[in-house]
Amino acid sequence: MTEPSDLLAERRQKLERLRAEGIEPFPHEFGEREDIGEVRAAHSGLAPGIETESRHRVAGRVVARRGHGKAAFLDLRDGTGQIQLHAREDVLGQEAFELLVHLDLGDIIGVEGTALATRRGELSIQVTRWRLLAKSLRPLPDKYHGLEDTETRYRRRELDLLANEDTRRTFRVRAQTISEVRRWLDDHGFAEVETPVLQPLYGGALARPFVTHHNALDRDLYLRIATELYLKRLVVGGIDRVYELGKDFRNEGISPKHNPEFTMLEWYEAYADYRKTAEDLERLVAEVAERVLGTTKIERDGKEIDLTPPWRRVTLREAIRERAGIDIAEHPSREALAAAMDTEPDPAEGWGKLVDGLLSRSVEPELIEPTFIVDYPVEISPFAKRHRSDEGLVERWEAFVGGVEIANSFTELNDPDEQRRRFEQQAEELRRGDEEAQPFDEAFVEALEQGMPPTGGVGLGIDRLVMILTGAPSLREVVLFPAMRT
């Protein structure tokens, strides 16, 4: 985003005039102050025309200015809200008044004054003292048109936040959502931990990693693609309820539902299974929505969605048969399923990858109401426990809302010999060219050999959850600085 050079030059000239007059345009501090939101709450019932003796000290950015003669009004905004400032020459004195009314939009100031309500009922602060806290050298985005170019909004998020109330609301919802998710887990006895972001082996998901190099150790390391394996080792160690909320990294494409750097929550509970985790997930999402939005009903693409439990459960086989007209159980080989799909798969795509593709293309977009797709093929779930009544399946679900997958869960595989066989199968897939297959993690297998109790685990995409709660059409709308192509 560029501004006319004469506007920039004019602001620079004002900066130099301030310094010439002995006014510091970038002081060190302002001291104790109140949030504007607190001031508004304290006087929410003030009747029109009433002036109080209640003194307040606030700071923020000047976003509007109007008035003439010996009185003026300015709008001041901080991170909690906006309030009108009433400035009068007979209160401030001529010099302070003139400096105030000639501020540029975007300048940051601190003010002291008393609360009043104008005859129209607008809560205001009668300014008695003020101070420049930061001179803005670039103009704000256009007041009426905002910042409309999508690419600029993502690259210059600070301008987007200044210009668009919808953006500010989105990221308030995001912050509150993360806070409420943590509160829910803490209240249910889970311990928050931190595990390595730089890992000697990547694992816990089917994805390509980012590779980096540690100079002192002279070895390659990987940015984690998931926290799963470390967290399950902690379950082995006796932390029966454990979670981590942080960044994962996957070297994959960018789309409305994918960003290479994303915020993921994983939690594990000893002595639970995928039925218990499904109940917990639907309760968590509904309770977070209620606390953040004040309702469990949201809107996406013009459709109302109720997050109230219980959510629908349907098997993967039933969902694909219903939406794609293919019974995957009747096509148990790669060749048979490819023929039924009328496709020529990539040599690295096995039967499981084809099933996953059917789910993504034919089923996922239709899952508007909250739905658990349950019971997946073992081929695409290397860390899930075999189904208790069908050896060809594993106990796994994925949760979908508004056509978006938001969470994934297993009854965790805790048989070390079976886990070793699964790793060997994944290693073979890796040798055949599947860049998303898992490398063999001997340390994890040895941890399982110590004995891991029956465990249920969940991965919840925080970015996608915020997408659902805000109605955002793309992940990039809910990530402050998303990855860009150029």
Identify the meaning behind each predicted range.
Residues 1-486:
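Class II aminoacyl-tRNA synthetase catalytic cores and aaRS-like
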